[in-house]
Amino acid sequence: MNIPQPAVALARRQLHFIWLIDCSGSMTVNGKIQAVNSAINETLPEMLKVAAANPEVQVMVRAVTFASGAQWHVSQSTPLEDFRWQPVSASGVTDMGRAFRLVADYLGTVSGRNLPPVLVLMSDGAATDDVSGGLQALLNEPWGKKAVRLSVAIGDDADLDMLQKFMSYPEMPPLRAGNPEQLVQQIKWASTAALGASSKLSHNSGNPQMPPLPMPPPPDPGNAGSWVF
């Protein structure tokens, strides 16, 4: 007699996705922070498409804001399909290093079975705290070092040197946005490309290498730095 076997649901591997968002006072100029809010809202449906193509992966989303200090804007990791963006506002200085340390502490609690995290940093200026120490703390964490890290320079005053150091692809410069439309394009590309790259490792869990990004180039920034509406 054939005895039916119980169905066994395969455990989905988690992929932790974190936006790190500059909310300093300069982000109020010409509506930059409003453009960030719009960009993330427009990016979420595209991220859902990437996730749908990788059903064995559970994408968990959080966000960190940094200004005078750093804090979790999204307090708990939330499944992408349940995630709703709450707008951020801007004021204060640029404590980017504290944001790196906050993320480092969190990644230290993430299970080793998961996929490489995705970290997308966006900033329009130079840090006002110990950003080098914060970045080193992030890279000292195994998941911080293995993360797919991309950065977006907003306007012409962003610290391109630090944004380059944050990137996990040294041959690739930070993405640049000189107006709201470009910012939407760059955040959308960075978020979906990085998410897709890390998700593909679910098919080859033994591969320790940094996942390659897809080849479609990020949008041409054109008037980078002008921030013209």
Protein language model features and the residues they cover:
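…and closely analogous acidic/polar surface helices at protein-protein or active-site interfaces
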Residues: 25-58
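Arginine/glycine-rich "motif VI" loop of SF2 helicases in the C-terminal RecA-like domain
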Residues: 51-52, 112, 139-147
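Short coil-to-beta-strand
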Residues: 10-21, 60-78
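Acidic, polar low-complexity linker/tail segments
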Residues: 1-18, 23-34, 109, 115
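Von Willebrand factor
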Residues: 71-73, 81-116, 128-130, 150-162, ...
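Extended acidic, low-complexity intrinsically disordered regions
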Residues: 155, 180, 201-229
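Von Willebrand factor A/integrin I-like adhesion domains
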Residues: 156-207
